[in-house]
Design a protein with these regions (language model features):
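Acidic, low-complexity intrinsically disordered segments
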Residues: 1-131
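Secondary-structure capping and domain/repeat boundary segments
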Residues: 129-173
Length: 173
């Protein structure tokens, strides 16, 4: 549970799962996506390991992504089996509902960069209130009213929107 004004520290760490010894890192990247209507990046809050580059990127669709990457230009660097890549902070500006900080585009390259190791990440849901507003976008069709639901609950299927010359193919569930 969080409140407007709280600061959330987001950390990216790599942990080798196949062995306990260090390894040679050639390249890695991760995008940690967040909703700028719910979070605000705290300026100058990024702290990273040596050689890690960071960028805050605006994405299509309105989300933002805090991008962290490393590229070795000299045949790789020795890294410990567990390495803290970096942290950054987000200020909660949302006043209701919840939002997910999503781990996307995580890649750890093999030597030569033509493939990558399997990776997993953990998304984090930050909850201000458990009441969420679900909005429907009909792309120029008839209006579909917003619904308020408790976090984790399902919405009630609304009436199908109409748009001249188009037929609704179906709803996602």
């Amino acid at each position: 549970q969080a409140a407007p004004g709280d600061i959330v520290t987001v950390a990216l760490a790599l942990k080798r799962t196949d062995a306990d010894e260090g390894y040679t890192m050639y390249a890695m990247q991760d995008e940690l996506c967040y909703d700028p209507e719910f979070f605000e990046l705290v300026e100058n809050s990024a702290m990273t390991a040596a050689s890690i580059e960071t960028t805050d990127i605006a994405l299509r669709g309105g989300l933002r992504s805090f991008y962290m990457n490393f590229v070795s230009m000299g045949g790789g660097e020795n890294w410990d089996a567990s390495t803290m890549i970096g942290t950054f902070q987000l200020k909660v500006i949302g006043t209701s509902g919840s939002s997910v900080i999503r781990n996307t585009e995580m890649q750890v390259a093999v030597e030569g960069g033509m493939d990558s190791y399997a990776t997993t990440g953990r998304d984090v849901t930050v909850v201000v209130t458990d009441e969420c507003t679900v909005r429907f976008e009909s792309n120029g069709g008839s209006s579909v009213p917003d619904q308020k639901v408790k976090l984790g609950q399902k919405v009630t299927r609304p009436e199908d929107p109409t748009k001249e010359g188009f037929a609704l193919a179906g709803w996602y569930s």
